[in-house]
Amino acid sequence: MQKTALVIMAAGIGSRFGKGIKQLAPVGTCGEIIMDYSIHDALEAGFNKVVFIIRKDLEEEFRRVIGERIEKITEVEYVFQELDDLPEGFTKPADRTKPWGTGQAVLAAKKVLDEPFIVINADDYYGKEAYVKVHDYLVQEQQKDGKLHICMAGFRLGNTLSDNGSVTRGICHIENGQLTGVTETHDIFKTATGAESRNADGSVQELDVKDLVSMNMWGLTPDFMEVLEKGFAEFLSGDRKSV
């Protein structure tokens, strides 16, 4: 069986509620957390390694709540996303407090990934079919054409809306089956006729519930890390405040 990894991004500060950390909050009848379902679905789809991207200060609680259990059923690695883990020549601004985002999180796992991998958020539920489709893409034989063969799982906007308020989604731009861009769109609400985004200036934009959106589920390869490193350095050279 080909080696493939599930990479779970759980280092984000996220929302704290009650006394716990969002990513570790139980949601199941037997105390399961969302990651339990994600890992179950991923292993069933064929992934055979789990990489947790966490903060160092969360390690003890993370291992206790989920890590030690998962170590009994599959290979597990822990890596740490830190604010000052930046490319050579860059330093963290003194006033920087929030994580740098998905790109830096994935780069934190570079040293433990030699196989194709799927990246997900720790606190999102994706469903079994998404893992199967991404896994099948990652293990299929690709043309030796010098291109990066990577993918993103797209979800119909209407299936990702909440009855309890707004959501933020990445609206996908697709041409001939190829993803050409993703526009992060905030304050998307379900409406009687579909969906709409409400802007800070009071304007409203109607959205098509059939549109594909990103839920931050990516199928990537080790070769992509070099591209990501270069892109992250270029980004840091520009407007850091927008990260």
Explain the meaning of each model-derived region.
Residues 243:
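Conserved small/polar residues in nucleotide/adenosyl-binding loops
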Residues 128-218:
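Conserved core of the sugar-phosphate nucleotidyltransferase
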Residues 70-115, 216:
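Short phosphate-binding loop-to-helix
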Residues 115-125:
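Short beta-strand-to-loop acidic/aromatic patch adjacent to the donor-nucleotide binding site
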Residues 14, 125-127:
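A short, conserved beta-strand element in the Rossmann-like catalytic core
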Residues 62-66, 134, 228:
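Hydrophobic packing residues within well-ordered alpha-helices of enzyme cores
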Residues 2-67, 73-76, 81:
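N-terminal glycine-rich phosphate-binding loop and ensuing alpha1 helix
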Residues 217-228:
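Conserved nucleotide-sugar donor-binding
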